[in-house]
Regions:
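Membrane-embedded alpha-helical bundles that constitute the cytochrome b-like, heme-associated redox core
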Residues: 1-187
Length: 187
């Protein structure tokens, strides 16, 4: 009987789940920056810093997740499968969601530093893709994650999706109405 050390498999699972939680927190912090549910009690700059830290830590956990999968003897993930969708022999479609999620998350995270070069409007447009990253990451976790059928994992995904939906609804419903120029003239 061949015995495989489960260390990297456990690390891959833990880092994947941790990455999902951190990226969920980043999305929520980003929504808090714009919707300001706490009014002026919490400084926008502080929440923005927290948002960035969650994003960077999440990206680090995604990288650790990929490295652990490559080093694990059970899955035997080729390095190229971390960068090219559908190269994985383990659940290729489900893993492809993760590859695309990681790449888009990296692009959005790098855009923090490029905001002045690409312009605020383009940066904001790119930032809307965060919702796509969150959705793809959720699909990846539910379809590739070996713990996805566990009650605690289902509760985690449901809580994350519910929180993002609620925070998004809050942002949309509490957005101040800006008068149009025509309305301003008639007033």
């Amino acid at each position: 009987m061949i015995h495989h050390d489960p260390t990297f498999w456990l690390l891959a699972r833990a880092s994947g789940i941790t990455a999902y939680v951190l990226l969920t927190c980043s999305v929520l912090a980003g929504l808090v920056v714009k919707s300001r549910p706490f009014g002026r009690k919490v400084k926008t700059a502080s929440v923005t810093d927290v948002h960035r830290v969650f994003a960077l830590l999440g990206l680090g956990m995604i990288a650790l997740h990929g490295v652990a999968l490559v080093l694990d003897q059970t899955v035997r993930m080729p390095v190229a499968a971390l960068f090219v969708p559908f190269l994985s022999h383990y659940r290729p479609g489900a893993v492809a969601w993760g590859v695309l999620t990681a790449e888009l998350a990296a692009l959005i995270t790098v855009s923090f530093s490029l905001r002045s070069r690409i312009g605020a409007r383009n940066w904001r447009r790119l930032h809307w893709a965060t919702y796509l990253v969150f959705l793809m990451g959720t699909v990846h976790g539910l379809t590739a994650g070996t713990d996805a059928s566990q009650p605690w994992a289902r509760a985690l995904y449901l809580g994350a999706v519910g929180s993002v939906v609620f925070a998004t609804a809050w942002r949309v419903l509490t957005r101040p109405v800006r008068p149009t120029p025509a309305l301003e003239r008639s007033a």
